[in-house]
Amino acid sequence: MYVQEHRLWGLMDKPHSAPCLMSLSLSFLICNKGRNAIRVQQSTDERMDAMLLRQCPTQGTRKNHESNSSLHHVPNWIFHSTIIPPNKGSKRCLRKVDWLLPRAGGVGGKRGVTADGDRVSF
């Protein structure tokens, strides 16, 4: 059912900001990855809420493909919706928090997405 396990980390951008996930306290599973969307949840428990992240096109021009090639391979994932299981015994534990995904195909640097749909680069 779970195609591949990936670790996703939360980031606390500002100490006084809303509760965010810390990298050493929680991990997530990508339980379903499509072409333009991924479903993420905290465990393999089907009663847990999941979050759906959708991919947006990367920004930038393609005039100089060699110098900007890394820009075109970094997906922008934004929060789309929370998936609540239909069964009555649902365990709701995912909240609107900040997400941080490893940057694909690059060394260093990360691209963050917030639950409100904002994209941030680190």
Curated annotation (Swiss-Prot):
Protein's recorded name: Protein FAM223B
Source organism per UniProt: Homo sapiens
Family per similarity comment: Belongs to the FAM223 family.
Taxonomy, superkingdom: Eukaryota
Taxonomic path: Eukaryota, Metazoa, Chordata, Craniata, Vertebrata
Gene that produces this protein: FAM223B
